[in-house]
């Protein structure tokens, strides 16, 4: 069984719009288990640990990195870890395409956001796409310890766990 943990962050635009409950319920309804959660105001140092300069600049640009740091810094976010069978892929599917205009209806981004990269770049701000989710297992393993200590990640059983994990 490929049981994984992955990091999710309801970004400032999602928090300001009151979407935390809507986002979390999408994951819980499919059987993913929340094993850690916290709401906090992100300082610039934490933002820079999460959004690695070299990675973002290589894939996008320095302007995109700067806008990400500015967007998430000094703003409230709700960050959480979910666990489940192949949870990284499941979470990415439920989130939808990173660029909201490409996200299909029924996904978090498809239902709650609509901006495009072009519009965001022209305006000089980060894309408002409600949620961050680890892209792959390596990212999840790097990101989770940035946001959570080991003792903040819980191990418990949901009542319906055997329905999802074939106990």
From Swiss-Prot:
Places the protein is found: Cytoplasm
Kinase is among the record's keywords: yes
Cross-referenced InterPro entries: NDK-like_dom, NDK-like_dom_sf, Nucleoside_diP_kinase
Record EC number: 2.7.4.6
UniProt: ATP binding residues: 11, 92, 98, 109, 129
Alphabetized PANTHER family for the sequence: NUCLEOSIDE DIPHOSPHATE KINASE
Pfam families: NDK
Requisite cofactors: Mg(2+)
Function: Major role in the synthesis of nucleoside triphosphates other than ATP. The ATP gamma phosphate is transferred to the NDP beta phosphate via a ping-pong mechanism, using a phosphorylated active-site intermediate.
Family: Belongs to the NDK family.
Reactions catalysed: a 2'-deoxyribonucleoside 5'-diphosphate + ATP = a 2'-deoxyribonucleoside 5'-triphosphate + ADP; a ribonucleoside 5'-diphosphate + ATP = a ribonucleoside 5'-triphosphate + ADP
Enzyme class label: transferase
Protein name per the record: Nucleoside diphosphate kinase
Keywords, in A-Z order: ATP-binding, Cytoplasm, Kinase, Magnesium, Metal-binding, Nucleotide metabolism, Nucleotide-binding, Phosphoprotein, Transferase
Predominant place of localization: cytoplasm
GO BP term, pick one: GTP biosynthetic process
